[in-house]
């Protein structure tokens, strides 16, 4: 089975063994958890009291350092240039020998969408640990289209409030995605933040 199911009868959950993800039924609700080589997550998907089971905590752990500020600044630079044309932009961040690598894939850009030209094996999409797209002048909020598209196990981000025509303070919004469910993340946990960039989840 690709998905496993557990009852939380003690505070110590067994190691994650499901090929995709696991549901945990706990005293404080239903949780979804998954792991990959560089991170693991346990996030709530339903808040409900279940008598006789042990409560479970939301957890997110990583085995990598923060994305350097120089890389974040480059993302802002490209996103700002796209915003001048009122286009969205797409970025992937992957790890190579423990170092972050920014990949800007060939992409189809419009005013309200952006898509990579390829998603197959060996593509930047397939390698990505972090996936970010920009919303130019629009707010840094995940849309229903984002929810439909962002169904893998990775960190997702959206950058908004990019207005190159005047002084601006762009905003980033991050979340960990666990196969169609999400939990917000503070950006400074993942990125070295440039002074100009604000965090939606810290406001």
Explain the meaning of each model-derived region.
Residues 1-130, 137-203:
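Conserved beta-strand-loop surface patch within small alpha/beta domains used
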């Amino acid at each position: 089975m690709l998905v496993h199911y557990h009852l939380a009868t003690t505070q110590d959950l067994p190691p994650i063994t499901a090929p995709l993800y696991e549901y945990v039924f706990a005293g404080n609700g239903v949780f979804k958890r998954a792991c990959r080589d560089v991170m693991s997550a346990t996030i709530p998907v339903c808040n409900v009291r279940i008598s006789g089971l042990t409560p479970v905590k939301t957890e997110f752990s990583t085995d990598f350092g923060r994305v350097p500020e120089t890389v974040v600044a480059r993302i802002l630079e490209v996103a700002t240039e796209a915003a001048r044309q009122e286009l969205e932009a797409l970025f992937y961040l992957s790890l190579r020998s423990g170092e972050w690598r920014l990949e800007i894939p060939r992409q189809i850009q419009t005013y309200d969408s952006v898509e990579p030209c390829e998603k197959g094996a060996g593509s930047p999409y397939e390698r990505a640990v972090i996936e970010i797209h920009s919303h130019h002048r629009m707010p840094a909020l995940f849309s229903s289209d984002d929810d439909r598209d962002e169904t893998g196990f990775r960190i997702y981000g959206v950058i908004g409030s990019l207005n190159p025509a005047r002084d601006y303070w762009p905003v980033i919004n991050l979340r960990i995605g666990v196969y169609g469910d999400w939990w917000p993340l503070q950006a400074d946990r993942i990125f070295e933040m440039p002074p100009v960039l604000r965090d939606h989840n810290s406001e």
